[in-house]
């Protein structure tokens, strides 16, 4: 997409090994019952902090690569990857806002109805923007290459991108239908 090597091999290694440590930490703490008790946001605050740091490393490397690219055209696919980084960062920071009271425990910034709304805004969009937008970006690059044809309509792909960004992110409350809220 960028016709350039990754911005930094060191950042790539930190990103890779950081995720491995996060996975191991989650695999150890979750069975021990050390959780926040929120679906899709179970991990305790030190692991959430590590996720934030590793996500910033990922973004730094991605944006560095985009900046040093040799391809003049910025493919729509890259827009979807940028949206993934920005949206997941905002989602994670807002949902994982905690007030630590010990090394392993914390209080959420939210309670009651606000907690439920923030939880499902996060739960819905963490899946949507962590899984769906990178896949769409991949398809916007791969399908035209595989078909050996350009994207049917660049304008339509731009409309698709902005519609996804401005409309899909607010769909989380449907997880609360038929609940006490």
Give residue spans per PLM region:
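Juxtamembrane/interfacial segments at transmembrane-helix boundaries in multi-pass membrane proteins
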Residues: 71-78, 85-122, 134-135, 139-143
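Transmembrane alpha-helical segments in integral membrane proteins
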Residues: 1-2, 58-64, 133-147
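Membrane-interface helix-loop-helix modules in multi-pass inner-membrane proteins
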Residues: 1-73, 96, 100-108, 168-181
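Membrane-interfacial loop-to-transmembrane alpha-helix junctions, especially the N-terminal start
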Residues: 4-20, 73-82, 148-164
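Short aromatic-rich membrane-water interface segments that cap or initiate transmembrane helices
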Residues: 40-49, 112-128
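Membrane-embedded translocation segments of transport machinery
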Residues: 132, 150-181
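Alpha-helical transmembrane spans of integral membrane proteins, capturing the lipid-embedded, hydrophobic core
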Residues: 19-23, 81-85, 89, 125, ...
